[in-house]
Each structure stands twice: as structure tokens, then as C-alpha cells.
Design a protein with these regions (language model features):
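Start-of-domain marker
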Residues: 1-21
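Acidic/His-rich structured neighborhood in mature extracellular/periplasmic domains
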Residues: 16, 21-129
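Short, Φ-rich (hydrophobic/aromatic) sequence segments
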Residues: 79, 83, 87, 133, ...
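Generic surface-pattern signal
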Residues: 89, 93, 113-116, 131-135, ...
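A cross-kingdom marker for long, charged
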Residues: 137-172
Length: 172
């Protein structure tokens, strides 16, 4: 089943020719079982998006070569791939306990091999407290395993049972 999501790139400034500074808004939702409702899963804003792009240039991502040949050009596809894996991981977590783990590992691989270059931020622990590094770190760190239990409990045992067993859903 397709995951309903949106990526909105808001270009804030042109740093130099074909180099842009932007904010990325990411949203994702999942269906609530037995209803026509959608439940919001992700609503995040990433202010650290700097990338190089020339009109009509294809966005290509290679998981084996995250940095590509040019860090500026590789950054935007790496950011999109990172958030795609995070969304898929959270979606799987909402249907199966710790079901998203393989996708979180893929997102972590992108962080560990992220493009590095002039003006590129958001991939390192010292780039702030609300960035791509800390998001995947908090989801993959064993100390925070309760996050997966809560996510699964809220969506699968809670919202998905509101139609057929409201008492059980509210106790979850």
C-alpha cells in the first residue's frame, strides 16, 4: 500500500549560482483500519537543506555512493532518501512491533555516509539538536526502544481498534 506523504521544498536564498538554501517540510500519514480516516505519523521541518541543482538535472541517489561525485549535488537526493526511509520505517513500526528497524538502519547508513561540503549541515551531531543525525540516532538507539512500543501501541492497538473495540483501543 502506498504511504501518503509530502515533501515541500521552500527555497529561502540562492547562495551562489545553482546553489540553494532551503527548508524542507515533511509530512506523512497512514490509514486507520476500518475507516476512511488518515492518522498523521510525521510532521517535521528541516531548516538545514543546502543543495546544488541545475535546471532539468535528474535527482539520482545511489545507496552505495551516498556522497556521489559532488557533495552539493548529492545532498538533496540523500536528504530525500533519508526521509523516505524514516517514513517507511515509521509506517512499518505502526503496523508491526519494531517492523521499521531495517529502514531505520538504511537511514542511519545515509547519515554515516552523508555528503560533506561547503554549507552542508544537518548530518552531524554537532549541527544542532533537531537534525537528521539526532532523529535517526534517537530511533535506533536501544535506550529508546520504548518509542517503538509506543508507536505500535498508539497506531495498531489504539487507532486501528477504535471502530471495532473502542474500550480496548482506549486502554492501549
Amino acid at each position: 500500500e502506498k504511504i501518503e506523504c509530502s515533501f515541500i521544498v521552500n527555497i529561502e536564498s540562492i547562495v551562489e549560482t545553482n546553489v540553494y538554501k532551503a527548508t524542507l517540510s515533511i509530512q506523512a500519514a497512514r490509514p486507520v483500519y476500518g475507516s476512511s480516516y488518515k492518522a498523521s505519523m510525521v510532521n517535521f521541518q528541516d531548516p538545514d537543506v543546502t543543495f546544488k541543482y541545475q535546471e532539468f538535472q535528474p535527482l539520482e541517489f545511489n545507496e552505495a555512493r551516498v556522497q556521489g561525485t559532488d557533495a552539493g549535488t548529492a545532498n538533496l537526493p540523500a536528504i530525500f532518501a533519508y526521509y523516505a526511509y524514516m517514513i517507511i520505517g515509521l509506517d512499518y513500526d505502526s503496523f508491526a512491533l519494531k517492523g521499521g528497524e531495517p529502514y531505520f538502519r538504511k537511514a542511519l547508513n545515509i547519515v554515516n555516509n552523508a555528503p560533506e561540503g561547503k554549507g552542508i549541515q544537518g548530518w552531524k551531531m554537532f549541527d544542532g539538536l533537531r537534525n537528521r543525525f539526532w532523529l535517526v540516532e534517537n530511533v535506533t538507539n536501544a535506550r529508546n526502544n520504548v518509542i517503538h512500543d509506543i508507536f505500535y501501541g498508539y497506531y495498531r492497538n489504539g487507532l486501528d481498534h477504535l471502530i471495532d473495540n473502542e474500550t480496548l483501543a482506549q486502554s492501549s
